[in-house]
Amino acid sequence: MDVSILRDVRPPVTSYAPNIWADTFSNISLDEEVQKKYAETIEALKQVVRGMLMAAATPIKQMIFIDTLERLGLAYHFETEIEHKLQKIYDDNVCGDDCDLFTTALRFRLLRQHRHHVSCDVFDKFLYEEGKFKGDAEGLLSLYEASHVRFHNEKILEEAERFTRQELSCWIKLQSPLKDKVKRALERPLHREVPILYARHFISIYEKDESMDEHLLKLAKFNFNFLQNLYKKELYDLSRWWNKFDLKTKLPYIRDRLAEAYLWGVGYHFEPQYSYVRKGVVLSIKIIGILDDTYDNYATVNEAQLFTEILDRWSMDEIDRLPDYMKIVLHFVMSAYEEYERDAKIVYGKKFASPYFKETIQQLARGYNQELKWVMEKQMPPFKDYLKNSEITSCIYIMFASIIPGLKSFTQEAIDWIKNEPNFAVKAGLIGRYWDDIGSHKRESKGGEMLTVMDCYMKQYSVSIQETISEFAKAVEDSWKEVNEGWVYTISMSKEITVQFLNYSRMCDASYNRNNGDGYTDPSFAKSNITALFVDPIII
């Protein structure tokens, strides 16, 4: 068929499930007095818990306490004290030849998660034959968790992950105090957990723990409910902002997913001081979603090309050249950008952020436009060419740009760094891209009518869909090793900046990595997480 004919063909339109939350978050009423009492109780309990942390007598007790604080979502209250304790544990080389497997693995994981350089050679003494490790149940679980902060070429940790996964899989069938921890760890290792989602889960586990401390549990519960009320207020404000555009009526082909977008914001930074980070993420995801659905689900190749060119010129002067639905899209993109520009310049004093945010929007549109041409003209490229374009359509750069105003340590130097496409960022983006390609294959193939990247891979390498999924999953594992290395070794940038790539990777894992689903498209997929974080408080 003549390719020029295909350029005016509209793709088969997917009808997405409606927004299941309706007006849940736009009709919220918050009691400020309750929030004030929560804050007062938290401050009092923090003093008690800080005393407990400082009084922990041995390095082992300190590490266990720090690990518990992090699991409960409380570590941000004691960041300075925790960093000081871990620095001393690192400097003193705690866990020489005397520590058991549990303690050795805990130290290794905590130090790597806090960007310390530690060698995996510490596990050599626990390897009693090829690929097998000696240790009790808690020790093997601790080793399993430690194995997921591994780098490339750390063979002993590859063996540890395989061995402990096999051993732990047998334990979930047994009645054991560790059963709940093991089951959750096998679903998603701790290092890949979204911190606030895991905290919500772990509070109920900690409550049943024989070693549970009442003050710590009480602080965790009050802290979570305080955060939840804050999230509800932010969701209320964002709902009112989103609803004023009424795009779900004007553009019926798009996914109406505000709560799901906000879930990503909380995944990036759940702490109260990062309110703008959450807003910025929502802003970027709404731009991403509308552009993605327009290019992928409605526009013809010729319409998309015109839109991309006009967006590249960043001018409303040519808007009348666009079809009516694209005028609405352009108006929204410009309006969202102006909101960002105002916040960046006036509220946060980061005028330098706006040009880069604009650049990432244009860059993303070009990436989507290229994908549309490949699909509609039925000329999928070699997989490596698709993968290069995927660095852009992973949305890692636009989402990174969107949070700049909310990060105190962010400077022009950080923008220059990210523009050089560091491997750390590229690999984080590919984690999202691979999981998205797996999760969205069924939707994007339009019942087999349209080509997807998985079709491209299957054809090029003559493999089945299951083999393709397996290869993509392996690529995710390799990318995680790069992300771990980037997290530890990218010391030229502050932790506040680099943690964004780690948390992006975690959110991708949570959004796409279960049953090959797509947590943004299918509202039922994210429902339990949204309910747990934004609807149901913890009973105190």
Swiss-Prot record:
Which reaction is catalysed here?
(2E,6E)-farnesyl diphosphate = (+)-gamma-cadinene + diphosphate
What Gene Ontology molecular-function terms does this entry list?
Answer: magnesium ion binding; terpene synthase activity
Q: Which cofactor does it need?
A: Mg(2+); Mn(2+)
**Residues annotated for Mg(2+) 1 binding in this entry:** 292, 296
Q: In which pathway does it act?
A: Secondary metabolite biosynthesis; terpenoid biosynthesis
| Top-rank EC class of the record's enzyme | lyase
Give start-end ranges for motif DDXXD motif: 292-296
Record keywords, A-Z: Lyase, Magnesium, Metal-binding
Q: Which residues bind Mg(2+) 3?
A: 436, 440, 444
Cofactor: bound how, per the entry note? Binds 3 Mg(2+) or Mn(2+) ions per subunit.
Domain notes per entry: The Asp-Asp-Xaa-Xaa-Asp/Glu (DDXXD/E) motif is important for the catalytic activity, presumably through binding to Mg(2+).
Write the protein's name. Answer: Gamma-cadinene synthase
Species whose genome carries this gene? Ocimum basilicum
Question: What's the source species' lineage?
Answer: Eukaryota, Viridiplantae, Streptophyta, Embryophyta, Tracheophyta
